[in-house]
């Protein structure tokens, strides 16, 4: 929130489900704000989503579960990833937020990011097998 030319300005960034679109959301916001405010400079990007039952997603999650012995299921997240820059891609990899880290270890994607060696080697195995399986799929 900031002031511009004597007016309060608020920027907004929101994520919305695949069952709607940016124009519909903008119309609903305009209808809700009434008088004394306006919605301007609306930009929108189509939500990025790939169904969990596609062969590629199944190959990735099946590989993860077979290697780890887990029973994980695919999930979506609200933030954007590098995957949205490709027509048919997802971010994929193990996420172990519950593991103890070395004293110097930082959080995932943060300064001094750390993970136990056995989990890094397990991740390499998952990636190799998943890539070999993905190579067999006719996209």
Model-assigned labels for residue ranges:
Residues 70-137:
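Zn-dependent metallopeptidase/amidohydrolase metal-coordination segment
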Residues 1-27, 45:
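Midchain, well-structured core segments that form catalytic/ion-binding scaffolds
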Residues 24, 28-36, 59-67, 85, ...:
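Generic non-transmembrane alpha-helical segments
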Residues 35-43:
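Conserved short beta-strand edge segments in small beta-sheet-based binding/regulatory domains
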Residues 15, 46-51, 114:
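Short, contiguous acidic/charged loop-to-helix segments that flank catalytic cores in large enzymes
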Residues 49-67, 93:
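Short, low-order "capping/linker" segments at domain edges
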């Amino acid at each position: 929130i900031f002031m511009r030319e004597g007016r309060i300005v608020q920027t907004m960034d929101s994520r919305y489900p695949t069952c709607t679109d940016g124009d519909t959301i903008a119309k609903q916001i305009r209808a809700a704000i009434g008088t004394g405010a306006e919605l301007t400079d609306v930009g929108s990007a189509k939500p990025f989503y790939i169904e969990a039952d596609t062969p590629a997603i199944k190959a990735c999650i099946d590989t993860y579960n077979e290697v780890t012995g887990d029973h994980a299921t695919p999930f979506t997240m609200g933030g954007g990833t590098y995957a949205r820059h490709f027509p048919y891609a997802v971010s994929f990899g193990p996420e172990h937020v519950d593991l103890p880290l070395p004293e110097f270890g930082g959080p995932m994607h943060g300064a001094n990011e750390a993970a136990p060696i056995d989990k890094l080697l397990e991740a390499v195995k998952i990636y190799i097998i998943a890539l070999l399986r993905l190579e067999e799929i006719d996209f």
